């Protein structure tokens, strides 16, 4: 495994400071690569300068300096931790990344499982058994430097990759590609140079440094040019209509979310968790009726996990639900917090989605409840989306959607009414009585939401 790094130098007069920053990045990247390191510089005329060594950059600092000059345009670099499956006892320069082809220079983090097949198919000849060495040879033979074509070539690779690629014929640009392996980009305004590496912490950017750091999108190919043009293409094309697994409680939010997705033309399946909570029976009854009404499939998951976790008043035997100020108190603070519930629900749903070929999972997470519950915050979903490529298998891209994520409760009711969501079948109450209690937080918000819209709430309450 490796750390891959690179630099696109926009102002060559800053080469000495660029070199200092690159050296710092390579030394910090030793935690991802301690066995060897290499630096390849592409000059403005397409010639290259090379420094390679076994060991750590911090132990061979003299090799990190004096390689750049005013004619340097692109730097491709690597720190390598040698996998057990590719151990080479007597290493030569041919065994050390970056690997250099007739036209392309490549640094690679990941594993290429079908390197032998590619070598045979394209009649390539490596000088080392290292799998990454196949890449510049493959690109030399099959790639014309077009970004769209690069995407097609990478689709042939079985395994994992984050790539930084230099082109001797075009020293004014750098290419990047990744599936689930990480890549970060940082533009240093003071150095007028664009740096790339495997982890953002290697940039060592302070809060007031003139540096913009961006994480590159998983499953993408990118071209960056010296005139600050960035072109990005997805490796995996998104379908216009998704198969979506909607985490559904039987309440207003998830019901409106599911209906909205359905009206947009997506193929929707509900997934409901029976987790030994007080309203379990009423929610199960509601979600079954909702699935039948919408004529969509329903998956039910039974779990005692939260009974074991305990410490939540929402669980049966967990204590009294807060009903102060007619429910307003419960609407404003997470008294009924269930430890990590939504994260667990999403994790199980993500696994099922991956196993059964769904494109996305969704829920009724919304802006209103984000005020009280951390796992209803839009940022929670944004972070899950960033995590998803690393929690699912290679070439399995599952999005997490929030159809009502930017809405508050009365807006959700309004939307549900307009799109014909079965609001009359929903169950919102934390209790599991014959009617909604009318005094818990969800009951309070529900009543207020219908009242604001001038609509009659179709459910009955014990207390109005």
From Swiss-Prot:
Cofactors: Zn(2+)
Which residues take part in binding Zn(2+)? 429, 437, 440, 443
Entry keywords, A to Z: ATP-binding, Glutamine amidotransferase, Ligase, Metal-binding, Nucleotide-binding, Zinc
* Binding site residues for ATP: 248-258
EC number in record:
6.3.4.20
Specify the Glutamine amidotransferase type-2 domain's residue ranges: 2-227
Textual note on the cofactor: Binds 1 zinc ion per subunit.
Provide the family line.
Belongs to the QueC family.
Its recorded name reads 7-cyano-7-deazaguanine synthase
Record the organism: Saccharolobus solfataricus (strain ATCC 35092 / DSM 1617 / JCM 11322 / P2) (Sulfolobus solfataricus)
Record lineage: Archaea, Thermoproteota, Thermoprotei, Sulfolobales, Sulfolobaceae
């Amino acid at each position: 495994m490796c750390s891959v790094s690179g630099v696109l130098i926009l102002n060559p007069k800053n080469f000495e400071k660029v070199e200092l920053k690159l050296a710092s990045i390579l030394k910090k990247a030793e935690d991802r690569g301690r066995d060897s390191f290499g630096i390849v510089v592409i000059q403005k005329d397409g010639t290259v300068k090379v420094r390679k060594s076994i060991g750590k950059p911090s132990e061979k600092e003299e090799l990190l300096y004096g390689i750049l000059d005013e004619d340097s345009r692109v730097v491709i670099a690597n720190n390598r931790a040698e996998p057990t499956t590719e151990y080479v006892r007597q290493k030569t320069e041919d065994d050390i990344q970056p690997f250099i082809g007739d036209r392309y220079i490549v640094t690679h983090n990941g594993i290429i499982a079908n390197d032998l097949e590619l070598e045979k198919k394209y009649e390539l000849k490596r000088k080392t058994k290292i799998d990454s060495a196949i890449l510049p040879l493959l690109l030399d033979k099959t790639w014309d430097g077009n970004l769209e074509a690069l995407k097609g070539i990478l689709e042939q690779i079985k395994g994992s990759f984050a790539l930084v690629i230099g082109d001797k014929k075009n020293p004014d640009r750098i290419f990047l590609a990744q599936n689930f392996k990480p890549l970060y980009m940082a533009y240093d305004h003071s150095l007028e140079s664009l740096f790339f590496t495997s982890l953002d912490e290697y940039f060592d950017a302070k809060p007031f440094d003139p540096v913009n750091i961006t994480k590159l999108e998983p499953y993408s190919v990118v071209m960056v040019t010296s005139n600050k043009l960035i072109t990005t293409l997805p490796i995996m094309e998104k379908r216009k209509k998704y198969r979506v697994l909607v985490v559904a409680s039987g309440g207003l939010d998830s019901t409106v979310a599911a209906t909205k997705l359905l009206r947009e033309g997506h193929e929707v399946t509900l997934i409901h968790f029976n987790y030994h909570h007080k309203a379990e029976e009423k929610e199960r009854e509601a979600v079954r009726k909702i699935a039948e009404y919408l004529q969509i499939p329903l998956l039910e998951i039974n779990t005692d996990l939260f009974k074991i976790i305990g410490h939540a008043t929402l669980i049966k035997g967990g204590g009294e639900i807060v009903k102060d100020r007619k429910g307003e108190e419960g609407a404003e603070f997470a008294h009924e917090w269930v430890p990590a519930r939504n994260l667990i629900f999403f994790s199980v749903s993500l696994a099922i989605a991956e196993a059964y070929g769904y494109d996305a999972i969704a829920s009724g997470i919304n802006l209103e409840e984000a005020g009280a519950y951390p796992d209803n915050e839009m940022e929670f979903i944004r972070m899950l989306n960033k995590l998803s490529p690393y929690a699912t298998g290679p070439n399995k891209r599952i999005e997490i959607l929030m159809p009502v994520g930017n809405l508050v409760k009365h807006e959700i009711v309004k939307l549900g009414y307009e799109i014909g969501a079965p609001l009359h079948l929903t169950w919102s109450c934390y209790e599991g009585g014959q009617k909604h209690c009318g005094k818990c937080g969800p009951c309070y918000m529900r009543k207020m939401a219908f009242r604001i819209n001038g609509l009659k709430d179709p459910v009955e309450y014990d207390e109005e």
